[in-house]
Design a protein with these regions (language model features):
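Glycine-rich phosphate-binding loops of nucleotide-dependent enzymes
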Residues: 2-262
């Protein structure tokens, strides 16, 4: 299990971004983390994978543990060794390198199995296999996202953290990515899916958490969230005709769960 407990994060020594965030990702499950821009989703992932330094961020309170071991403030390479891999928002592939070269870079912590893992990833993504010797920058957006996911899988992770994998993709490609996430999970990889596309995320995941302004404001099994009136209105755009969309801050009739310690 990957567990985040009472996490607080501050940027630039003054900006409190996460305010006591707590959630769990049971082994073998897909958990979605939903929220609008600025809610703190990406900061959560950066905290787990040790990338807060990029934005001068610090964990000031709370713990992150994987399978019972505290990994709070571990460096990124050590976290990868613990079986955690991240796919960054916006794909972030090396466009001037070939598909195979991108994959090879993802396997540097598992060098003994690089070639066999490359073959395994290319078998999973036939379109990448066809273009394995071509420069990654010439791939389509969907193909680049597949490459980014494949590169993360090169380290044989137990936990895969996906940051906005549907961003900028056409609906048909979003469906393909959703099917791919399910396939990866069926192979034994536990998944944290960070998304603004609530419909896709909740249809893929087992459990969902909703963030606003650095807090977890709601969590439930995904099938329950899909039927929740407030989730349907605010995240799925299914509000009654002619009414204004509201913030969860203004919602009074659902039960918020306080997820941080007093």
């Amino acid at each position: 299990m990957l567990s985040v407990q009472n996490l607080e994060v501050v940027y630039q020594d003054v900006i409190l971004v996460l305010r006591g965030v707590s959630f769990e990702i049971p082994k073998g499950k897909i958990v979605s983390l939903l929220g609008s821009n600025g809610s703190g989703k990406t900061t959560v992932i950066r905290s787990i994978t040790g990338l807060l330094d990029i934005q001068n961020g610090d964990i000031t309170k709370g713990t992150i543990s994987v399978d019972g071991e505290d990994i709070t403030n571990f460096n990124p390479s050590k976290i990868v060794e613990k079986g955690i891999a991240q796919v960054l928002e916006g794909r972030r592939i090396f466009s001037e390198l070939t598909v195979v070269e991108n994959l090879r870079l993802g396997g540097h912590t598992n060098s003994q199995d690089i070639q066999s893992n490359i073959e395994k990833v290319l078998d999973m993504f036939p379109i990448l296999k066809q273009r394995s010797k071509g420069e990654a920058g010439y791939l389509s957006g969907g193909e680049q996202q597949m490459l980014a996911i494949g590169r993360a899988l090169m380290s044989d992770p137990s936990y895969l953290l996906l940051d906005e994998p549907s961003l900028g993709l056409a609906p048909k490609l979003v469906d393909q990515i959703a099917d791919l996430i399910k396939e990866i999970n069926e192979q034994g990889v536990t998944v944290l899916l960070v998304e603004q596309n609530a419909n896709m995320a909740l249809n893929v995941s087992d459990h969902g958490y909703i963030m606003e302004t650095g807090n977890i404001v709601m969590d439930n099994p995904s099938e329950v969230l899909l039927k929740d009136e407030d989730v349907r209105e605010f995240y799925l755009g299914l509000n009654p005709e002619g009414t204004k969309r509201k913030s969860f801050k203004d919602v009074k009739h659902y039960k918020r769960k306080k997820r941080w310690l007093s």
